[in-house]
Regions:
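Hydrophobic anchor residues at the C-terminal helix/turn of individual leucine-rich repeat
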Residues: 14-17, 37-39, 59-63
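Conserved hydrophobic beta-strand positions in leucine-rich repeat
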Residues: 1-3, 21-25, 46-48, 70-72, ...
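Extracellular beta-strand solenoids
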Residues: 10, 25, 36, 48, ...
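Leucine-rich solenoid repeat scaffolds
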Residues: 62-149
């Protein structure tokens, strides 16, 4: 579904679309919470860039095991608790307490290899993490043999 560059103010409730492969709605006027996408089990790409989103529902991205790209740049998001999501996450230019950060979380299914970031950073279950940004405030240990660097 491609809805970019319109004046949409909402995106409905997409959880009942299990065959949805991509959802692109950047450059609109979408407000409020990102809805629950957990029922979109084939979703691989989501772009809600440059909207007016402030939060997302708990579990909005759970069960999205095929997801590999989310772009949430240029919104008004204030939360980062994406513990179970292993994707390319572009969340900079928001109001997240940890700072404007572009984060790549790559899905690695062979072995655990989890990074030991504190849960308050929202990335405690990430297997691969690449963070780009200034003063992003992450702390914790990296396992001695990471799966990928």
């Amino acid at each position: 579904m491609y809805f970019q560059n319109n004046n949409l103010t909402g995106i409905g409730e997409p959880e009942s679309l299990p065959n949805l492969y991509t959802y692109q709605a950047p450059n609109n006027q979408i407000t409020g919470q990102i809805p629950d996408f957990s029922g979109c089990t084939n979703l691989r790409s989501l772009s809600l860039r440059n909207n007016l989103l402030t939060a997302y529902k708990d579990g909005a991205f759970s069960k999205l095991y095929r997801m590999n790209f989310i772009d949430l740049k240029f919104n008004n998001l204030t939360q980062t608790d994406l513990d179970n999501i292993l994707i390319d996450l572009h969340s900079n230019w928001n109001s997240i307490k940890r700072g404007g950060v572009s984060i790549n979380l790559k899905n690695q299914t062979n072995g655990d290899g989890s990074l030991a970031f504190p849960s308050e950073a929202g990335y405690s279950k990430a297997r691969i993490l690449v963070a780009n940004g200034w003063s992003i405030g992450l702390s914790g240990g990296i396992p001695p043999e990471p799966t990928e660097v």
